[in-house]
Structures are given as structure tokens and as C-alpha cells.
Amino acid sequence: MNSLTVPIGLPIEIKKSGAPDTQGLILQEFKYPFVAKKYNLFEEEKRLVWPESPEWELELIDTLNWSLEKAIKEFRNEKVNQKQKEQNLDNYHMTDYKSHLHIKEFDIISRLVLDNFCPKEHNFRTEDCWGALYRKGHYIQTHHHWPSALSWTYYLKTSPNTEPFVFVGQEKEYPIYPEEGDLIIFPSVMNHRVSVSQTDDERIVIVGNIR
């Protein structure tokens, strides 16, 4: 398949009572030129257009990766921990879903992805961006990111021993074995998962949703 028509769930209106107006749910569609795409930011580094930022002058992927890993490992927030437990996501460490709004490194990586790898004909913006750290015993159940339009996962740290990123189709599964620096972009409607890690090697990723 060379292209895919992707439904986009737009924000719904809220009634005066505070309840969502589900009848007001609007769907748009856009033609995406591929089902999933993988890049490596180390290989793409020379052609990247970096966002202007007075707080970030070093246009080096290696430096950005180091800063992102540090930010993820140092992140602590009781509200995020509680939300993870409520969503049964407490088997790994993560930052909050809006990290791009208050952590400069997340803002930089989200803008790099949006400006360099996403379709220009749509007025997309980053809706969510967060970091996650997985160790032995950690996993991700099958899920999707709709109603976002596109989603992406960027691999800060991984090894040949970590579990693959798996797209789950109706009849078969499609594993991807990422390397450090790999960026996977895909329509948010695509189901995906990661099996239970059997290694002590860390897997550290940044995840983003675009709408």
C-alpha cells in the first residue's frame, strides 16, 4: 500500500452542562503517502532544519539525545504516577503527555519531527509529546493513538536485545527492530505494541502525537 486515507478526530464541542457533545464529533481525512516510515536522525542530521530557539543553540543530535535522556530519568511527578496507575501504565517510567510545553528538549525534538518529516500541506501541530524508559519486565499492550492524525516514536536508547516495535494488523504483525536515532512515523489509527522485555538493557523513547 503506497498511501492511506487517515481519519482525524477534531476536538468536540462541550455542552453547557460540561458534557461532551458527541453528535458534534467531526471527522476529517487526509491522504498519507505511506503507511509507516522510518528515518535515522544521525543519518539525516546534515539536512535537518532546526527550530529557532534562544535556549538551544547546539544543533547536534547526539547532544539533544543526551539532554533528553537526562530529562526523562530526572523527571518526577506524583500526578503523572497516579495517572499511570489509573491507566494501568505503571510498569514503566514516563514523563507527562505535554512535556513539549515545559521541557525545552521535548519542544526541540517535537518541532524537528513536525518541520522535517511531516506533510506540509496540512496545518499540523504537536498535540502530545512524552518520554518513556523501559527496563526488564516492561511492555506496551496493543493500542492506537487515534484521534490524532500521525504519531511517532523516536529511539534515544535501545539495543539488539530489546523487543521490537510491532504493528498489529488484522491478519499478521509487522515487527520493526529500531536502532538508536531511529524515528518511526505512522498514522495514529495503526495498532501497535511492544512485548515484555527480557533484557536488562534500557529502551528509552520519545513519543509524539500530531493533529
Tell where the protein language model's regions lie, with residue ranges.
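Catalytic core of non-heme Fe(II) oxygenases with the double-stranded beta-helix
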Residues: 122-196, 202-205
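Aromatic-acidic/polar surface patches that form glycan- and anion
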Residues: 102, 106, 145, 199
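Non-heme Fe(II)/2-oxoglutarate
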Residues: 3-122, 139
